[in-house]
Amino acid sequence: MALVEIRDVYKSFQREEQRIDVFTGLTLDIEAGSFTALMGPSGSGKSTLLNLIAGLDKPTRGTVRVAGAPVSEMSPSQLAAWRARNIGFVFQSFNLLPVLTAYQNVELPLLLTRLSGKERTERVKLALDVVGLADRADHYPRQLSGGQEQRTAIARAIVADPTVMLLDEPTGQLDARSSQEVLTLLQRLNSEFSKTIVIVTHDAHAAERAKMILHLEKGDLIEKPRVAAAAAR
Amino acid sequence: MIPIVYNVRSVVRRPVSTTLTALGVGLVVAVFIGMLALANGFRAALAKTGSDANAMVLRKGADSELSSGLGRDVASIIAADPHVAIAPDNRPLVSPEVYVLVPLGKVFDTTQVANVVVRGVSDQAWQVRSNVHVTEGQRPASGRADVCVGKRLVQRFPHTGIGETLRFGGRDWKVTCHFAAAGSAFESEIWGENEQFMPVFRGEVFQSITFRLKDPAAFDEAQRSLQGDKRMTVDVHRESDFYAQQSRLLGTILGFLAVMITSIMAVGAVFGAINTMYAAISSRAPEIGVLLTLGFRPWTVLVSFLAESAFIAVIGGILGCLFALPLNGIVTGTTNWSSFSEIAFSFRVTPLLLFAGLTFAVVMGVIGGFFPALRAARLQVVQALR
């Protein structure tokens, strides 16, 4: 059974008088332990698909299940609790809280768990260590480079050990070197820690690091999933 | 829960709007505390005036000393009553008193007159009223036109210094002493010998008779016995109850005014808080989106922003307390509507009042923050993140 099951999903938005159909019967499986890149032009529904998997948005019709949980049928309150346990989300613009240090930002998801203060400290240190920012724990976001901010955001996404990591254009605002660092980190998380990763990207080089590339156009998968070069190697 | 440090630091990051909102709340709290300190001071002055150990006799039906009248026969009956305490010199601790209001010009503007209480007392009055003591000079000598001036009058009325001569009731009165009475309303009175005042003012009649109870716990029995005495028609009050009653009307009005005026001002401060919080929330929508994405529930976002608004209000409340504290002890005067006499008293800023001010600030903060916080909690994550 796939980790993420998307079955016959329709999603439409109303913009003024006009109805925009993003998905019209999308069906897709994402396996546990996979590293999938979602590609496609702007407006093809990549980010919407990510939001549906994370339970940030609901399909107009159809079902989304993640690890057996009926995401598309949960209430907002159930979704919040479910997301805290199962989803690690990374945004294009990092979205760290500017008034909190790197440490405090990474700790945020753990405040929703029953872990003790000591356990939280250990987990945060480990996450910052994995992303190579153990020495930046007390820095505020404004004191970090773009690449460091994004790695902090990734530490925040992995700290609670979620079922799936969802990344929306994680290298969109980074220079080439920082992009490489982030992508290498994601590969490592997938291969060493068996994290299931789904990234949305415009960047073909970024997508090459994934094991699987899916192309979306106007809400449809226009070609069968293909195995990326990195995975083939 | 969303850590409070997030809110505290967010508040500190926008110092101008925080300061302005806090100042708005602070001013309201200062006025709130100031007005209640006024009411508090007035009540306290009158409450301290009466003693639980004393009983006060008025003509039946009289609700103030002004409207009362008791003959010498009544004074004699009471002096002989077994409920009256006896002094070591074997004299009953009774003070039949003359109570009149005299218009005196104020020190800064003698065309402005205030009704000052002139109380003619017996020699025992100084023992019956244990809170009264001479601070300077000698007590009025029996048989002489001497007066002792309450210390609160000294600064406020001319010719009240020791050795000076006050003129009222068509006669001159020599000031021989000043007295204190633990901040009570007696400090706004002029005392002299009752026998001296009687012929000058209202003839052979006392306005009240106050006596020390032999057993303060036996007040009810004393009251029943004296009120049931067929030889006189009197009402007997416990002195403390009488003065508390005297403060009730004006005290209630001052308290009501405090609430009314500060409520109107509070509306302005609440709108200030609403404005600040709406601005904060609209500029931090992506942060709220992140918190909701991480799994914080909408109600925790609501609580977090309510706490932020309350935090700003608490800063305002502390400022308000600091603004209001210097009022403590400032002496002011007003006419007591129950006796039509001038009474001077101090603003009393008590710890309880400061706590009430802070609580009021928090209430303003929570009310002002509620709708913005509700908007934050209801943000659609996808829209908030855009």
Stretches found by the model and what they are:
Chain A
Residues M212, D220-R233:
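Conserved beta-strand-loop-alpha-helix hinge in the C-terminal portion
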